[in-house]
Design a protein with these regions (language model features):
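Catalytic-domain carbohydrate-binding cleft regions of carbohydrate-active enzymes
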Residues: 1-183
Length: 183
């Protein structure tokens, strides 16, 4: 496969360096070669569509983590769509950043020349983005622990609630909540 070849060729040419790559195509065994990415999602033309797109990422990330690649992420801020009214998007931006802090990899990304720096969304959004990013850094020892577990067992960092609470039947019908590790 492409990802296997890229990894092998990189390691051949750079024996003392680790390779990092992301893919949105997946099949069994791919987790040995790459990080998963859900692909381009959009915010649409208005804030309402953006909320739906962000909500859609959670079940996609959980499914990918369970079935294909335990290290899977999404484009924080939604990637596609014009942002014409930054103040109107501030709350959505804040929630994207907060949700993204609990992705195995946090990556703010948007298409073209659309700027997504926190300060563009106002002081409150900037403050909240900073807090989420600082939390992610404080969690690094925890993340490393569960990343090791994911490597050894295949259990993802982002986990559906039913993995931790299998006796609670309600956890099997929710796809909007998740655990980050088991604690």
């Amino acid at each position: 496969t492409w990802d296997k070849v890229v990894k092998e060729q990189f390691e051949k040419r750079n024996p003392n360096r680790r390779v990092f790559q992301m893919t949105r195509a997946a099949f069994a065994g791919l987790q040995r070669y790459t990080f998963g990415w859900t692909g381009d999602c959009g915010n649409g033309d208005d804030v309402t569509q953006g909320w739906g797109q962000m909500a859609n990422q959670i079940p996609v990330l959980l499914s990918a983590g369970l079935g294909i690649i335990p290290f899977t992420t999404c484009d924080i801020t939604g990637y596609c769509g014009d942002i014409e009214d930054y103040p109107a998007m501030a709350e959505l931006y804040t929630r994207w950043i907060q949700m993204g802090a609990f992705n195995p990899l946090s990556r703010i990304h948007h298409e073209g020349n659309v700027a997504v720096e926190p300060w563009l969304f106002g002081e409150e959004a900037e403050k909240n983005a900073k807090a989420a990013i600082e939390l992610k850094y404080r969690l690094l020892p925890y993340i490393y622990t569960y990343a090791r577990e994911a490597h050894e067992t295949g259990l993802p960092l982002m986990r559906p609630m039913f993995l931790e609470y299998p006796a609670d039947m309600e956890t099997f019908s929710t796809d909007a909540l998740f655990m980050f590790g088991s604690e």
